[in-house]
């Protein structure tokens, strides 16, 4: 027992050297964040998706949070050609092939409605492009988990992937979890969320590992009192379901919001425009970055956001 406990204790000399190694690695670019397509987002988040970090991305239904996360999953492959990685996506809200459908929508500039022949059959030329891009996507180092798991099952899957594909290499390990409230319960919602966040805190301590989890907003932000008061338009910590557990575990807490879908024409005390706009609020930045708002043009018809 004493020997096991001693493995949990490390002297300052070891931890300080780890800090030196990390700063040195960032300085000589042997350790890098994974860039996304959004320069302002990258700037606020230490260059992109940073190792040993938990990101929480929250929003109401229809806000674009899943599309935002989906773009990140392919961006980090496309925009970081010198980096090796493994991406594990827990796609609990939709089956994996529909996630790929969203990626095809973005890359081909076709709506998913068009790709799925909802009104007219997809034309031959576009279908050939679907096949071509899909064959490229088959080479991406991405794996999917479609079925909801308990926190312990998620932890076992993460450990398996780390030991099988990451351990002993310099690869990035990116875990994406869509989304937290769809976790198979082990008790109350609060108990389940607390255990899930324990899993993510543990996982981010693996070398070169990042966790991105999606979360749901509660209904508070949709109340008439909030909608009719510009001072109350912006999302707050209390608007996120299971906020205490998520905030404690997260290095970044990000809320994606489309005030337009709530009927708001001028957003917040600064009267920001809402037509075809999506706003990204960074509510928490553990590295002391100030809370900020990033503006995007709504391109969600093609499962994309365009940084303004």
Name what the model sees in each region.
Residues 176, 209-216:
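Structural recognition of the conserved hydrophobic beta-strand(s) that form the central parallel beta-sheet
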Residues 83, 206-208:
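Helix C-cap/helix->beta junction micro-motif
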């Amino acid at each position: 027992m004493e020997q096991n406990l001693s493995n949990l204790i490390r002297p300052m000399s070891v931890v300080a050297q780890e800090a030196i190694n990390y700063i040195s690695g960032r300085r000589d670019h042997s350790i890098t964040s994974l860039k996304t397509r959004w320069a302002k987002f990258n700037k606020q988040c230490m260059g992109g998706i940073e190792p040993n970090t938990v990101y929480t991305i929250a929003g109401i239904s229809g806000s674009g949070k899943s599309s935002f996360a989906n773009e990140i999953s392919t961006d980090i492959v496309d925009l970081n050609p010198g980096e090796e990685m493994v991406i594990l996506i827990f796609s609990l809200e939709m089956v994996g092939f529909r996630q790929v459908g969203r990626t095809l929508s973005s890359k081909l500039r076709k709506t998913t409605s068009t790709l799925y022949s909802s009104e007219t059959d997809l034309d031959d030329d576009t279908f050939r492009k679907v096949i071509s891009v899909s064959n490229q996507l088959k080479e991406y180092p991405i794996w999917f988990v479609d079925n909801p798991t308990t926190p312990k099952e998620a932890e076992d899957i993460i450990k398996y992937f780390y030991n099988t594909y990451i351990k002993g290499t310099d690869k990035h390990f990116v875990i994406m979890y869509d989304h937290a409230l769809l976790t198979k319960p082990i008790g109350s919602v609060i108990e389940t969320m607390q255990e899930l966040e324990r899993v993510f805190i543990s996982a981010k301590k693996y070398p070169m590992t990042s966790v991105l989890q999606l979360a749901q907003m509660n209904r508070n932000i949709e109340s008439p009192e909030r909608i009719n008061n510009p001072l109350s338009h912006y999302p707050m910590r209390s608007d996120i379901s299971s906020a205490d557990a998520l905030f404690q575990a997260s290095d970044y807490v990000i809320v994606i919001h489309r005030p337009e879908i709530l009927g708001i024409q001028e957003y917040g005390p600064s009267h920001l425009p809402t037509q075809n706009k999506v706003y990204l609020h960074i509510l928490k930045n553990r590295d002391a970055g100030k809370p900020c708002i990033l503006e995007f043009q709504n391109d969600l018809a093609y499962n994309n956001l365009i940084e303004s």
